[in-house]
């Protein structure tokens, strides 16, 4: 069905995601899930539309890296830091819920997301100030991410908020014991940077994130644990926020989320997956993010190895991340994004089917 749609755009994705959420709400006999999704979808549209004026007023404009595809130079001076309008509504919702429930899990989630939000904000702000594509140095950004992640992981592990088990199904789990700590670090820092790398084409990261948040929210519901339902509400809210932002971020983008958005989105996904023991399923849902990240690792690794062996570096892809490879192959930007969305939808369906049947 998905493959037969001639043009799968923002509206198509919203309609499909909304339909899926209505079905999910019906099956779980609770339409609050659809309600928060719709509410935050329109909040996101309203805030982004009006926030664009503020971004333009302060000249928070994107700088394009010289090493990227040449057709991206026309995107220079597109308003950026749109992640502010995505993450602040989420943080306000999370703060309200945290105050009402006084949950240590929610407190840790709030502080972790806020930490990644500030990291992304600093990176974007310095990039704009320096009129360069990079704000914080790679090492500086990694150190900040690492410190925030380690604090979150150690506190959560000490309070037994992170399970040492990686649950594959109700009857099958892998006991990682103390090794869950490096796994948790890899999940949190890895998914954050993977979303960041995916945010290279108009609407790619925002669309995929909206799809993944729906999948993660549904997977948590399938656990049947009442105390975890609040995390489903948070996921569905973020799904609505991402798709609301997508209205202005889809091709041709009027605004970019920047690291303020992408790093925070990854932190939300990783933190919630760790706190709800959903690592395995998230790894399936996030297939696009993971592939994008792996393409960079493979490209850099292969180049360094061949340079050492043959004194001349060789590349597997025309350019990494993977979406740039397809761009240089001549595939239109919107077509690449459309196909990546479709693949992500199939990955979410696969993850949910496995969750139900394993």
Curated annotation (Swiss-Prot):
Superkingdom of origin organism: Bacteria
CDD domains: GT_MraY
Cofactor(s) essential for the protein: Mg(2+)
Gene Ontology MF, one: phospho-N-acetylmuramoyl-pentapeptide-transferase activity
Gene Ontology biological process terms from the UniProt entry: cell division; cell wall organization; peptidoglycan biosynthetic process; regulation of cell shape
Recorded catalytic activity of this chain's protein: UDP-N-acetyl-alpha-D-muramoyl-L-alanyl-gamma-D-glutamyl-meso-2,6-diaminopimeloyl-D-alanyl-D-alanine + di-trans,octa-cis-undecaprenyl phosphate = di-trans,octa-cis-undecaprenyl diphospho-N-acetyl-alpha-D-muramoyl-L-alanyl-D-glutamyl-meso-2,6-diaminopimeloyl-D-alanyl-D-alanine + UMP
Enzyme Commission number(s): 2.7.8.13
Assigned protein family: Belongs to the glycosyltransferase 4 family. MraY subfamily.
Protein name as it appears in the record: Phospho-N-acetylmuramoyl-pentapeptide-transferase
Annotated organism of origin: Prochlorococcus marinus (strain MIT 9301)
Originating gene: mraY
